[in-house]
Amino acid sequence: MSGRNCLTIVLAAGEGTRMRSSLPKVLHPVGGQTLLSHVLAAAPGGPGTSLTVVIGPGHQAVADEAKRVRPDVMTFVQDERLGTAHAVLAAKEAIIRGADDLLIAFGDTPLISADTFARMRAPLRAGASLAVLGFHARDPAGYGRLIVTDGRLTAIREDADASPEERRMTLCNAGVMAFDGRTALRIIEKIGNANSKGEYYLTDAVGLVAELGLTAAVIETGEDEVRGINTKAQLAEAEQVMQARLRKAALDAGVTMVAPETVFLSADTSFGRDVTIEPYVIIGQGVTIADGAVVHAFSHLVQASIGRNASVGPYARLRPGTSVGDGARIGNFVETKAAVLEAGAKVNHLTYIGDAHVGAKANIGAGTITCNYDGFNKHRTEIGEGAFVGSNSSLVAPLRIGAGAYIGSGSVVTKNVPDDALAVGRGQQTLREGWAKRFREMKLLARKQKTG
């Protein structure tokens, strides 16, 4: 922003006890990504920016997640939970390095946008020492009110301390703040703990700014964007908002969804042009769907790629490592895992393909299973281009079926099959004419003798 550099501190030290979970609060998912990852993705990045996350003791998993999302991140530990200002000062080492702008955000607000972070910095460029993010609450009870006088923020009044007139105000504190880096540390270090809990509250910075004769401003945003997550119910509400956003973005990008309210997407889902998603499809992390592909109803996809004009489902499950080539088909009640299907390959019914490579235009018959696990290790199956595997076949890995080869239906194949060969691995059929009639007569006679 106009050459100003920026340090963002994300506070993520809370235990999240109301989540009633052993998982740290900020690692719970919304839209297929952790709460923390959404905030870090929205935070300013690129040249002239730096990022810090404050974590709680023993929360190495939070530090690891931060590093996964933003490899440039620094992490600091808040050893004691003594309030938000105390948490910010846990990252004092990063603050004293100097930055024009200091953004302070929270790891449990996954709906906040990069645009809002950018707008928070604008008053600093205009000379303000502090900007506070606010929103008009549908029900403001319990929120701190932002008291604005002559266009300037003069106080944050907690609900319990507010006058009747102030309680009627709907402009509330969202918690996110932006400080002018030149005065930030001086202000934050002056915050005291003379309150019932003996904690250091960042909200007290507004009063200190006024005492110093400096300016504090308010930036407004929508209530949904600043939803904090403290309970599983709030997590579910945030998921609803996130899914509505993701569906709208997909529709705006040209994806056809007949019943979008039944489709669940991940924040990193990538769509090509003219993609169709039928009802009741769940798309997890790491899925890319190329131009013209169709995902039919009741399918579940995670960490998979679907090629141009390919077809998946209905009732298909694509597990991590699946790659479906251009024009390939995955049909009903098919499960794939760590499987590559080349262009035009067909796996149309009732099949498991795992740890396998299926060549272009190969056809896999109904009921085929790649037997990839021997109880200790996984093994691969290679099926060549144009091969035909008959229905109800078991392919015992490690195994290679050559290009153009045929596998007879009902076979158990344990040895490699050369190109263009026929393999039949089933028992010899036995035929006894009249046996069924004699068997029924024998059973009926035995029943009559037993009943007398």
UniProtKB/Swiss-Prot annotation:
Annotated cofactor note: Binds 1 Mg(2+) ion per subunit.
Family of this protein: In the N-terminal section; belongs to the N-acetylglucosamine-1-phosphate uridyltransferase family. In the C-terminal section; belongs to the transferase hexapeptide repeat family.
Extract the ranges annotated as region (N-acetyltransferase): 254-452
Report the gene name. glmU
Protein name as annotated? Bifunctional protein GlmU
Q: Which SUPFAM superfamilies match?
A: Nucleotide-diphospho-sugar transferases, Trimeric LpxA-like enzymes
* Catalysis: reaction(s): alpha-D-glucosamine 1-phosphate + acetyl-CoA = N-acetyl-alpha-D-glucosamine 1-phosphate + CoA + H(+); N-acetyl-alpha-D-glucosamine 1-phosphate + UTP + H(+) = UDP-N-acetyl-alpha-D-glucosamine + diphosphate
The source organism is Nitrobacter winogradskyi (strain ATCC 25391 / DSM 10237 / CIP 104748 / NCIMB 11846 / Nb-255)
Indicate which residues the UniProt annotation says bind acetyl-CoA.
366, 372-373, 391, 409, 426
Region annotated Pyrophosphorylase sits at: 1-232
From the UniProt record, give the pathway where this protein acts: Nucleotide-sugar biosynthesis; UDP-N-acetyl-alpha-D-glucosamine biosynthesis; N-acetyl-alpha-D-glucosamine 1-phosphate from alpha-D-glucosamine 6-phosphate (route II): step 2/2; Nucleotide-sugar biosynthesis; UDP-N-acetyl-alpha-D-glucosamine biosynthesis; UDP-N-acetyl-alpha-D-glucosamine from N-acetyl-alpha-D-glucosamine 1-phosphate: step 1/1; Bacterial outer membrane biogenesis; LPS lipid A biosynthesis
Any GO MF annotation of the entry: glucosamine-1-phosphate N-acetyltransferase activity
Coiled-coil parts of chain? none
Q: Which UniProt keywords apply?
A: Acyltransferase, Cell shape, Cell wall biogenesis/degradation, Cytoplasm, Magnesium, Metal-binding, Multifunctional enzyme, Nucleotidyltransferase, Peptidoglycan synthesis, Repeat, Transferase
Q: Which positions form S-S bridges? A: none
Q: For this protein, what is the EC number?
A: 2.7.7.23, 2.3.1.157
